[in-house]
Regions:
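Acidic/Gly/His-enriched mid-domain segments of enzyme catalytic cores or analogous surface patches
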Residues: 66-68, 81-85, 106-107, 113-209
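Glycine-rich anion-binding loop/nest that anchors nucleotide
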Residues: 89-95, 112, 196-197, 205, ...
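A structural signal for short, well-ordered beta-strand segments and their strand-loop junctions
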Residues: 176-177, 213-218, 255-258
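Buried, small/hydrophobic-residue-enriched core segments of structured protein domains
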Residues: 183, 216-218, 235
Length: 258
């Protein structure tokens, strides 16, 4: 990248957001969730601040591909792909296995481990993840799928371990960084939402794609989906109730499996 382009992209990053600001209701939901579970916003801020600082370095984790200007360019390309997709399907943890051949002309966005439901990763535009998608997330990262990686108070060690591992790949995935704190952090975004599933919808919405033009599969609150990470089932159902509320505020509650 020449110096002129570097300065141009750096200016774009600082002066023009790729994501539209999240609605107040989607951001306030994050505080409501913290209150409901007794979580501290300070922990969210600490994890996200560490992520921001790590990725502001030259060649973060030894990878020039993860510098701010390169991540900005990758996010612009992702935005174009999401907004121009003729048919866009968002895959949640309750999805059955998906044969891409049954969805001609379709591109996918997956919520964390739900990427494992899709049999052709070349059709997956990105995975929205807080890092607990296990082998399914790992396979997507190894395949070069763009990862929208989320920092929160309970996953600091997890996201750090993942990026250290991905940095060893010959071709590491493109990264976009998100958080859920009421702060502004350089190089990161807060699209709103709480679970990987509803955060994926918030992310798509923030990029400018109308949620009236998308489809959802595997979004349900009655059971814990097969693609969810290891979790306490009852606690997970409480989290899924908040996913439902987030989807209600987005106006897409009708996408839930009843």
């Amino acid at each position: 990248m020449n110096l002129t382009m570097h300065i141009f992209l750096q200016g774009c990053w600082v002066g023009r957001a790729v994501l539209n600001p999240a609605a107040d209701g989607l951001l306030s939901l994050q505080g409501e969730v913290r209150d409901a579970f007794g979580w501290s916003e300070e922990a969210d801020v600490l994890s996200a601040s560490e992520m921001s600082q790590q990725f502001l370095k030259d060649a973060p984790f030894g990878r020039p591909e993860w510098e701010s200007t390169t991540r900005y360019s990758a996010l612009l390309r992702l935005k174009q792909s999401i907004c121009s997709a003729e048919r866009l399907v968002v895959v949640g943890a309750g999805s059955e296995s998906i044969a891409v051949s049954d969805y001609p002309g379709t591109l996918f966005v997956a919520a964390d481990g739900a990427v494992g439901a899709v049999d052709d990763l070349t059709k997956v535009l990105c995975v929205v993840s807080d890092g607990d998608g296990a082998e399914h997330l790992e396979r997507a990262a190894q395949s070069g799928v763009h990862i929208v990686l989320h920092a929160h108070g309970d996953n600091h060690d997890g996201w750090l371990r993942l990026v250290e591992a991905w940095a060893q790949f010959e071709h590491p995935p493109h990264l976009t960084l998100t958080h859920q704190a009421n702060v502004v952090l350089e190089g990161m975004h807060n699209p709103g939402g709480f679970t990987d599933g509803d955060r994926a919808l918030c992310f798509i919405h923030a990029l400018g794609r109308s949620l009236e033009e998308i489809e959802c599969v595997g979004f349900r609150t009655d059971v814990v989906g097969q693609w969810s990470g290891t979790t306490n089932p009852e606690r997970k159902k409480r989290k899924l109730a908040w996913m439902k509320e987030s989807m209600r505020r987005l106006g897409v509650e009708h996408h839930l499996i009843r």
